[in-house]
Amino acid sequence: MKDFLKNVGATVVGLFLFSVIATVIGIMGIIGMVASTEATQTTSDNSVLVLKLDGIMEEQSSQNEIANWFSDNEDGVQGLQETLAAIKKAKTNKDIKGIYMEGGSLAADMAQMQEMRDALVDFKKSGKWIIAYGEAFSQGAYYVATTADKIYLNHVGVIDWHGIGGQVAFYKDILAKVGVKIIPFKCGKYKSATEPFTEEKMSEPSRQQTERYIGGWWNTICQAVSQSRGISVSTLNTYADQVLSMEPAENLVKYKLIDGLLYNDEIKDVIKKRLGLDKDDDIKQLSVADMENMKEETNGDEVAVYYTYGDIVDRVPKQNLLQNNHFIASEDVCDDLESLANDDNIKAVVIRVNSGGGSAYASEQLWHAVQKLKAKKPVVISMGGAAASGAYYLSCAANYIFAEPTTITGSIGIFGMVFNKSELMTQKLGIKYDEVKTNRNSTFGSADTPMTTEQMGFIQASINRGYILFKSRVAEGRKLSMENVEEVAQGHVYLGEDALKIKLVDELGGLDRAVAKAAALAKVKTWYTGSYPEPQGFMEQLLNSETVKGNFLDEQLHLTLGVLYEPFMLTRSLQQMDPIQARLPFRLQVN
C-alpha cells in the first residue's frame, strides 16, 4: 500500500510539473508565433546601429528560444551571418548615420572576428562613423573595436591585452590511477588528438604546428591594431607582457590604445553630438535583430548559402530543451544538399563550413553528397574559423575553396581510440569475467577485456584504409598527386594563408567573396542569397528534444566527482563517439 501511494504521489507530481512546463512552453510558442508575424522594420532619420561585442558568437544566431530564455547572455547567441548582414545594410541605408559598438567579452573564433572587422572597414568607406565604448574589452572585442573612429572606456574600465596562449590537459596518469587505458591508433605524425590520453606532454610536431597558428593569429591581430591605432607591433607586444588589465585606465589613454575616458551618460552625449541632436533628444537605436527584419530586395537568381558548423556526426543526438549545441549530421545534410541540387531556382551553392571534424564515416557521406551536388551546379566552400580534418574532407569535393588567412584547415589524417577498462573492472572493482565463444575474436570490441596484438592490427589496418581513402579524395578534388597529398597530410594543421601556398585552398576571403565566385561560376549576373537549412520551428524543437533531467544529473555528477568530472566525461564521450575519427586535437578561442 505504501509503494502504491508513493507511485500515485509521484504520478500526481509528474502530471503537475508536466502541466506547468507545457503551459510555459505554450505561452512561449504563442509569443514566438506572434513575433514571427511582426511588421517589417523601418528606419527613421538619424538612426544608429548598435553592435554588442559581448557573448557567444556562432555562424548563425540561436533559434532555440527556450535555451536563449535561460541563457546568461540576455541577447542569446549572436550570429555572424546576421551581424555581417546588418553592417552591410547599415552602409547603404541613408537613415543610419553610424555604428555604436558596445564593448564586452566576445567569445568568437579568429576568422569570425576577422570577417566582422573587414565588414566594419568596408562600412567606413561610406563616410559614416563608428564609435566604440565599454566598461571592459576582451582581447577579441578590442581587436574588432579598433576599426572605430574613436574608442572610449569607462574611468574604471579595463582592456584585456595579453597575447594568445593555449593549454592542453593530459589525462594519462589519472586514467591509469582508476585502471583505464586508452589505446591509440592513428595515421600522421601531426595527428595529435590522442595525445591528451596517452602522453604526458605535447609532442614536438604538435607543439610546432600549434605555435605556428597561434603565432599567426597574434600577428594578424597586432598588425591590424598597429595600423588602426598607430602603435608599433613591438610596442603592442610590450603592452601584452605588462598585462594591461591590471593597469589604471588613465594609462591606456597614454598608450594610445583608447581616445578617452567617459561615464555611461557622457558617451550618449558624444553620440548625440555626432547626430546633431540636443541633449534632451533620444537616440534612435537599431539592433542586429531590427536590421534582420528589414525588407530585402530579391532580384535575379538565387545563390544558396548552406551553413554547416559543429562536430561531424552520423545523426544529431538528442538534446534537452536547454541545450543549444550544433552538429553537422550527415543524414540531414545529405538530404538537404540533395534538395538544393534538385531546386532549379537555385543556381549555385556556397557551403559555409566551421568545424574541426568528427566521424570519418559521416565525413565520407558528406563528401559524396557534395560530389552529387557539384554534378548539377557550382559549389563553393567558405571556410570559417576551422575547416579541418573531416570538415576539410567534405570541402575538398567542391569546385572552389575560400578560407580566411586565420582559418584552421588541413589536418588530413585519421585516428581512433579504444577505451579499455579491464584493469578498472577486474583489479580495482574485483569483477570476474568468464566467456564462451565460437571463434577466436568473438568478443572483439569489449572494453572489459584486454585487446590482443591481432585485434589491434585489425583496427590499425582499418585506420590505414581510411587514411588512404581520405588522401585519395583530396587528390581527386584538388587535382594533386597522391605523393603531393602525402607531403601536406600527416594530420598537419595549417593556417588559411599557408594552405593557399600548398593548394589546399584556392583563395583567401570571406563569405561575400565566396558568394560572388559561386555566382560567377554559375554565370549569374544579378543574384540574391538564401540561407539554409531553414531553422526548426518551435514545435519541431520541442518534439526533437529530451527533458531537462540530463542537466540535473550532469550537475550532480559534477558536484560528486569534483576534479575527476572532466576525465570522467572525456572517457564517457570516447565510448559514445564513432571509433574512427577525423578531427582536430583541440580548439582555441581568442578571448
Language-model segments: what does each one mean?
Residues D3-V48, E59-S61, K97, D122-W129, ...:
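Flexible, low-complexity junctional segments that flank or bridge functional domains
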Residues G300-V303, Y307-D343, S462, P533-N591:
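Intrinsic disorder and flexible/low-complexity segments
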